[in-house]
Amino acid sequence: QRKLYDWLFALRSKQKVMDQIRLLQPLVHISGRFSAARHYVGVVLPLAWHPRNRNALIVCDLHLDPQVLLEEDAATLRQRLYTRHENLAQGELPVPLKLIHINRCPVVAPLSVLRGEDQQRLNLDMPLYQARALRLSDAQQVWQAKVQAIYAAEEFVPSDDPEQQLYDGFIGDRDRRLCEQ
């Protein structure tokens, strides 16, 4: 238990988290975004760093079929990424992308932490995950631009209403001087 605590405690450092990450090398990720049925455990494949947020890593959840990344265009993927799974049309695959924020103490570890009995207990199909990772690695030219386009698009539109602008972020220098008068 002490080694586990020390490992998790060390992950509060962004540098320690970054030391665990190698693009296109699968790793174990524990997250509340994974369901209790999955024991909150996921095997993910780091695809790329976020184009606008240097603290965010774009990963593919290998539990889900990544074929959708290879077949659909960026606009469709972006729309589907923010659609709840139960609201997807029958036959539509969910987009298996997720962000890991390295400045929020994420729990990540190399695949070597999973023993054979752990893989069985957690119902992890490692050969399937390895095959999916290999397929994505071989098809980088197909999904790379799409993934960047999905996350490069403006996600935040500032409001024109002055009262709502209070929630848009920091007040501009001109407005701050007016407030101080």
Which sequence ranges carry the predicted segments?
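DEDD superfamily 3′-5′ metal-dependent exonuclease/proofreading module
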Residues: Q1-Q181
